[in-house]
C-alpha cells in the first residue's frame, strides 16, 4: 500500500484560460507520479475529492466563474463543466450518514461490490456574496440557498457523522448549522432555519477550520484559525470555547494529528508551528491535556526551532519582498509526515520528529489551494490501463446530473435519483450466517501487512503446512542422492579417460 498526495494551485490571474495550471497525484514514499490534471485551479478550499482510483472524482470551483469542473480518474482534461448560479469560493463533499438501526432479522453481514458509478451524498459551497448552496449529487437538486454570512465564505466543512455543517467567513463569524434542517425541503412548517451555534469570538476573517474524526458526537471538536493570529478549539455539543492559542503571526491553515495529540498551523511568515495538546507534568510525571475551560495560552517564539518547520521561509524568487505564506496543510495517515504548500506553489513533505524536508514535489505556478492524502494498493499501477479503458467505455454512465438553479420541488414524488446498485459478494460464513472469525482475522493481518509495506515489493510471507515440508524434504533428499551418483560416475569417467591417454603416450 502506498500513500499519495493530490494538490492543486489557485491559478495565475494572467492565465485566463488556465492553460498553465495543473493538479498532480504523486506518491509520498516513492518517485511515482500517478496522474496529472490540466486546466486545474481553484480558490483556497475550493476543491473536493472523493478518492484516488477508478470511479473517483475531483470537484473544483473555477475562480471568478460560475462553474464547477469535474475530473474523472484516468482523464487529464475536464470531464464535466457544471454551471451554477454564482461563483463559489469554497466547497466540500458530505457522505451519507450510515444507518444506526441494526435489525437482527435482516442480513446485515451481506457484502456488496463497489459500484462503478458512485457519488457522495451532498456538495455544499459558499460564495463571495455570503450565500450557502447545497446540492444533492445523485439528482442535481438544489436543496438549500441561504444568506449565511454578511461577507464572503472562506471555508466550509461537514462533520463525518453528517450532523453538522460549519462555515467560516470574512465577517469573522463561524456558523454551525444542523444539516438536517438545511435540507428539509419536505418540511412544510413555516419556522425559520437558524444556525445551531453562532461563534463571534474572532475579530478578523476566518482562514481555515477542521473537525476531529469521531464516531461519538459528544466528542466532536472544532478547530478554527483566523487572521487575528488565534487558534480556537470548541466543543460543538456543549457550545463552549475550550482553548484559545495566540500565535505570533496570522494563522492561515490548520491540520491535526490523527490521534489528536497536536495541532499544526501554517503562518503567513512561512513557518509551520506545531502546538502540542498534551504535556507531561514535571511534578507528577503524568500526561495531562493542555488548555480547556476557556483558557488563553500564548504560544511563545520558538528560538530553538523545536516545534517549528522552516522549509517554506527559503524564497525562490530573488528581489521579492513579499513573505512566503503557508497556504495549506495536511498530515499522513500514520502522523509521521506533514505535507505543506505555500504561496510560491511549492509542496514539501517534512518529517515531524526531525522537522526536516524529506521530499519535494513538482511545483505549481501559483499558490497552493488544496492538498489531500489518500491511499492506493500495491498493484495500483498495473490496473491503470484497465481502469482507463473501463472509463472510456462507461462515460455515459458516469456523468453527474446537472445542478439545478432553483430550489427542488416540495413534492416528494418528483424526487428522482440515479444510483448504481452493485451485486452481492460471497464471504466465508459459519453456521450462524456470520463471517468466520479466523477468516476475518486473517484478512485484517493481510491488511496490516499491506499498510506497512510502502514499497512495490510484496513482503508477505506465506506459511505452509508440515505435510508440504515433509514432501519438500523427501524431494530434496532424492535430488541430493541423484546428484551424488552422477558425481561419482563423472569421477570414474575422468579416471578412465586419464588411463586411455597414458596408453596412447
UniProtKB/Swiss-Prot annotation:
User: Which InterPro entries does this chain map to?
Assistant: WD40/YVTN_repeat-like_dom_sf, WD40_repeat_CS, WD40_repeat_dom_sf, WD40_rpt, WDR18/Ipi3/RID3
* Coiled-coil region list: none
Keywords carried by this UniProt record: Nucleus, Repeat, Ribosome biogenesis, rRNA processing, WD repeat
**Location(s) in or outside the cell:** Nucleus
Gene Ontology, cellular component aspect? nuclear pre-replicative complex; rixosome complex
What's the superkingdom here?
Answer: Eukaryota
Which positions make up the signal peptide?
none
**An annotated GO BP:** rRNA processing
Q: What is its main location?
A: nucleus
- Residue spans of the WD repeats: 106-145, 148-187, 201-244, 321-362
**Function according to Swiss-Prot or TrEMBL:** Component of the RIX1 complex required for processing of ITS2 sequences from 35S pre-rRNA.
The entry's family comment says: Belongs to the WD repeat IPI3/WDR18 family.
Assembly with partners or alone: Component of the RIX1 complex, composed of IPI1, RIX1/IPI2 and IPI3 in a 1:2:2 stoichiometry. The complex interacts (via RIX1) with MDN1 (via its hexameric AAA ATPase ring) and the pre-60S ribosome particles.
Write down what this protein is called.
Pre-rRNA-processing protein IPI3
